[in-house]
Amino acid sequence: AQPTDQQMDARSFLSEEMIAEFKAAFDMFDTDGGGDISTKELGTVMRMLGQTPTKEELDAIIEEVDEDGSGTIDFEEFLVMMVRQMKEDAQGKSEEELAECFRIFDKNADGYIDSEELGEILRSSGESITDEEIEELMKDGDKNNDGKIDFDEFLKMMEGVQ
């Protein structure tokens, strides 16, 4: 079978080491060497790989991945699913982390980052950056042109960075 676009995307998202690690975990549960594992074992394999799906998430994942209802998942389907979980985890985490960053950067706690605060942040991270560059970043980030960056604008700026 030809790999689907999703499967190719999943492989390109992962490093060779990660694929090998996932394969090793997958193979432990592929007891008959048939190249697939039971959906019942999926949660165990995911937890071995550091994921923590809830029962509901797991059911939703199985329903999505086991399209033919065979009760089994092959390795390519497994990769797609792991990548999806990793991306969702990263998104959830990064928003919390960014909210935390925003609070730290917003020195006077007015709910905005101004160009002075932005300059401090960038310089403290070891960037050698000119005032012109800071103004440029402010202009790019400040979508409503009020001279300061609110949390939504900050999130959009950071999306561009990641």
UniProtKB/Swiss-Prot annotation:
Descriptive protein name: Troponin C, skeletal muscle
Binding sites annotated in the UniProt record for Ca(2+) 3: D106, N108, D110, Y112, E117
Residues annotated for Ca(2+) 2 binding in this entry: D66, D68, S70, T72, E77
Pfam families given in the database record: EF-hand_7
GO annotations of cellular component type: myosin II complex
InterPro entries: CALM/Myosin/TropC-like, EF-hand-dom_pair, EF_Hand_1_Ca_BS, EF_hand_dom
Domain EF-hand: 17-52, 53-88, 93-128, 129-162
Binding-site residues, Ca(2+) 4: D142, N144, D146, K148, E153
Residues the entry annotates as binding Ca(2+) 1: D30, D32, D36, E41
TM ranges: none
Key words of the record: Acetylation, Calcium, Metal-binding, Muscle protein, Repeat
Keyword Repeat recorded: yes
PTM sites of type N-acetylalanine: A1
UniProt cross-references to PROSITE patterns, sorted A to Z: EF_HAND_1, EF_HAND_2
UniProt-recorded Gene Ontology molecular function terms: calcium ion binding
Top-level taxonomy: Eukaryota, Metazoa, Chordata, Craniata, Vertebrata
Similarity comment: Belongs to the troponin C family.
Organism: Pelophylax lessonae
Family annotation (Gene3D superfamilies): EF-hand
Its job: Troponin is the central regulatory protein of striated muscle contraction. Tn consists of three components: Tn-I which is the inhibitor of actomyosin ATPase, Tn-T which contains the binding site for tropomyosin and Tn-C. The binding of calcium to Tn-C abolishes the inhibitory action of Tn on actin filaments.
Additional free-text comment from the UniProt record: Skeletal muscle troponin C binds four calcium ions.
